């Protein structure tokens, strides 16, 4: 704590002279917060820390309250590009949202290319980290917070809401939880979450397009807290959807859960793709091959690589203490994909719809723990939309 001029202690019932001020209050610009001793400061901590959260929330709101959108919506920013489906980008994008300086940041957050040097240092290795008990507690916390943020996004899904508005809410929710939104500036990704509508497979960039009745939309959330990343996503219905969308989304979720049921020590990672593809094909769908699940902990993406298609050559055997994601992307038509000129938005080559679900998992001695599970329900949100 920093030494300052003498004041009266702010602890209830104490009128002693106060010579110490809370260092966090100084950083956040909170006036007052003087205490006579460390003991009084610690005794007031339960209520005093609420001032910090309030100040952080207000600061974050001030940073975004003046944002405006200028100019008309441009739905064809890439002259000559032949879209595979009906979806179009809605430009211009809002400016990159700032993250307050008091939020701990991953190594790529301020890199000009968004490059994670810690990930690059391990690129090509197939060695899978065994998490310590401390690591596991860190993962449990960040995954629980990531689930809270996805649940906030879920409550916004309706016709007329833009994916930009969802991203805004996600960004503020991350900051309110003292978390960095992991996608932001990861290899220069411009937003705080991914929103993938209809034929978008993954990595859709939130923009000004309003969601429309009958859409399906995936929201992919990752948070960074205390050095750990937590990652999950769900696909949602926008209003009333057709039977094809219902079957696609239901099957995709079943693919994920059947794969999770197989997770336990001794299982080869490559086996998960066999389980997923068998169920997808039995329902008339295909499995995306270009994007995979991944290890996650202090690194956003690391070993193991977890393909979702059959007869893959993934390396590694599950052991207690491994943490990784399973996130199958299932398509109505063919599995082939291409990427929009923005360098991120992956779409089906035939323009048909794709759905995805994701959980972060901890391998335990007897099976696995779903770190990103819903705490208030065992069902994904789309089941409540039927």
UniProtKB/Swiss-Prot annotation:
Catalysed reaction, written as an equation: Release of N-terminal amino acids, preferentially methionine, from peptides and arylamides
Residues that, per the record, bind Zn(2+) 4: 231, 294, 327, 358
Modification type N-acetylalanine: residues: 2
Subcellular compartments: Cytoplasm
Binding-site residues for a protein, renumbered to this chain: 203, 301
Keywords: Acetylation, Aminopeptidase, Cytoplasm, Hydrolase, Metal-binding, Protease, Zinc, Zinc-finger
GO cellular component labels: cytosolic ribosome
Residues bound to Zn(2+) 3: 220, 231, 358
Cofactor entry: Zn(2+); Co(2+); Mn(2+); Fe(2+)
Record-linked Gene3D superfamilies: Creatinase/methionine aminopeptidase superfamily
Binding residues for Zn(2+) 1: 9, 14, 36, 40
Family: Belongs to the peptidase M24A family. Methionine aminopeptidase type 1 subfamily.
Free-text comment on this protein's domains from its UniProt entry: The C6H2-type zinc finger recruits ZNG1, promoting zinc cofactor transfer in the peptidase domain of METAP1.
Subunit structure: Associates with the 60S ribosomal subunit of the 80S translational complex.
NCBIfam families with a match to the protein in the record: met_pdase_I
Protein name in UniProt: Methionine aminopeptidase 1
Organism: Mus musculus (Mouse)
Lineage: Eukaryota, Metazoa, Chordata, Craniata, Vertebrata
Gene symbol of the encoding locus: Metap1
